[in-house]
Amino acid sequence: MFYHLLYPLHTAFAGFNVFRYITLRSIGAAVCAFLLVLFLGPLFIRTMQRLQIGQVVREDGPETHFKKKGVPTMGGLLILLSVTVSTLLWARLDNPLIWLVLLVTLFFGMIGAYDDYKKISKKTSEGLSAKGKLLLQIAGALIVGFFVYLHPGYDGQLSIPFMKNVQPDLGWFYIVFAVIVIVGASNAVNLTDGLDGLAAGPMVVSSAVYLLFAYLAGNVVLANYLHIPYVAGSGELAIFCGTLFGACLGFLWFNAHPAQMFMGDVGSLALGGALGSIAIIIKQEFLLAIVGGVFVMEALSVMLQVGYFRMSKGKRIFLMAPFHHHFEKKGWSEPKVVVRFWIVSIILGLFAIATLKLR
């Protein structure tokens, strides 16, 4: 909105010319989203407490989690509000990629909100059925998959880190691949959101890295120089990534141990869906496995645990899954698990950036 309202005035006052720069608007979007969450957070917490919308805790979970029962949840609504407002204020609204990512993010948020509502209303950790949730996620991911495959300028080619001349073309199967990436990312972030600040921290890192890659992918000179796919208009997604960065950082203010509120499925499913969608749109799909390594690790731990449990008829690989619970069972304190996972996330984020030159 600022671009459309203020940039045209640069002919009368040169200072308004700054609104054409993606870098400035990305910073503005991040700061705006951060401040929105920071200032609205206390009001949101009081409102959730008054409405008695609190966290439901698993009976078979670690005993240290029982004290989390009743802590305000669905903080993802606040994240989505700040992301939406900041995006509408700072992004170019004539860019279809902005609308695509924003609407898909909100759609995944709606899935999570309904899931949270069912959990809270039933006072149980079981919400929307796994099959129902998966079908809705697939429907949302298909929107991105079909858009990317059918939109002029896109194709079914993959961009593989470390290999500048290897770009396999999946053809129509790219749509299926896109669904796997987006749905997988959404569920991976959801599984990670089990400790105070555990999901928000890596999301800050991931959104910062994808902000950089979105900016580079939207600049034809830099994209060609770095041997990454050029995607016309994707530079504006740096602004959306900025809103994710700011919103998650602001949320972390209240979600750090001991948490004053949780994001709920409305937050985790939406953030994961947003991350996966951005990865698909800017053609940096495999980079997500690196920068989102913490999310991947958490998801894999659940799949391995369930698979091995069934194959071995009752035996387990980990003391408890997802992976963060394994370390809790080993005696690590919650803050220690979270901070160490943050450290891993930062290292992976830096490594992801390094892939720009390791080709």
From Swiss-Prot:
One of its GO terms (biological process) is cell division. The chain crosses the membrane at residues 27-47, 71-91, 93-113, 134-154, 170-190, 203-223, 234-254, 262-282, 286-306, 336-356. It is an enzyme of class 2 (transferase). It is a multi-pass membrane protein. Signal peptide: none annotated. Pathway: Cell wall biogenesis; peptidoglycan biosynthesis. It holds the Pfam family Glycos_transf_4. Its cofactor is Mg(2+). This is Phospho-N-acetylmuramoyl-pentapeptide-transferase. It comes from Desulfotalea psychrophila (strain LSv54 / DSM 12343).
